[in-house]
Amino acid sequence: MNTEKPSVAHNVDHNEIAKFEAVASRWWDLEGEFKPLHRINPLRLGYITERSGGLFGKKVLDVGCGGGILAESMAREGATVTGLDMGFEPLQVAKLHALESGIEVEYMQETVEEHAAKHAQQYDVVTCMEMLEHVPDPQSVVHACAQLVKPGGEVFFSTLNRNGKSWLMAVVGAEYILRMVPKGTHDVKKFIKPAELLSWVDETVLKEQHITGLHYNPITNTFKLGPGVDVNYMLHTRAKKA
């Protein structure tokens, strides 16, 4: 096993970037490949807004923003939002959609580690949704998010647990049976157990506040948040006050 960590500037999996570049033009198609993201976005936004005590007037960073679905919705809540992504095409789509929607979001193509080196403790809220399982060194991303948030600020992560059920649900079910997302979107080896994520959080100024599962019911075709983190889950952390 290679124990070398990717350099700060290269914590990027170009195969992962290519996957999303290929379908970027359909990011805002409510019936396309990103339909699940559109479906779960109200749940994500509601969780972030409630746990943060509202977003109005706050400075927010969305790490791995893609085409801007969450970033735009947080801007609509009155936040000043910056979106980071390493995919050129998704960012172009995000910028164009924000322009067409009259929503102001600043989008930047750089890694979160690079951003942290220049903007430490600058954000009230940092979000990192469905991104950790797509990079070579997710631990480095967690550390960078911790560096970017202000003392007392909130950091949110969401990812997929690594076990047999998550493989069946997120890979076999979502990609091959229900065809909710393109085949090859996920690699179960890159999924992250909650204990692993929490161990990385514990290495920083962040402290766990709450964890919840994101559940899909194929019979009713609905999503909900609730107990149980065996497949998708969201974690709310808070930075220690100075």
Curated annotation (Swiss-Prot):
Signal peptide: none annotated. GO terms for molecular function: 2-polyprenyl-6-hydroxyphenol methylase activity; 3-demethylubiquinol 3-O-methyltransferase activity; polyprenyldihydroxybenzoate methyltransferase activity. Gene3D superfamilies: Vaccinia Virus protein VP39. S-adenosyl-L-methionine binds at residues 44, 64, 85, 129. Pathway: Cofactor biosynthesis; ubiquinone biosynthesis. Its EC number is 2.1.1.222, 2.1.1.64. One of its GO terms (biological process) is methylation. It catalyses: a 3-demethylubiquinol + S-adenosyl-L-methionine = a ubiquinol + S-adenosyl-L-homocysteine + H(+); a 3-(all-trans-polyprenyl)benzene-1,2-diol + S-adenosyl-L-methionine = a 2-methoxy-6-(all-trans-polyprenyl)phenol + S-adenosyl-L-homocysteine + H(+). It comes from the Bacteria. Keywords: Methyltransferase, S-adenosyl-L-methionine, Transferase, Ubiquinone biosynthesis. Belongs to the methyltransferase superfamily. UbiG/COQ3 family. O-methyltransferase that catalyzes the 2 O-methylation steps in the ubiquinone biosynthetic pathway. HAMAP family: UbiG (MF_00472). This is Ubiquinone biosynthesis O-methyltransferase. It comes from Salmonella enteritidis PT4 (strain P125109). The gene is ubiG.
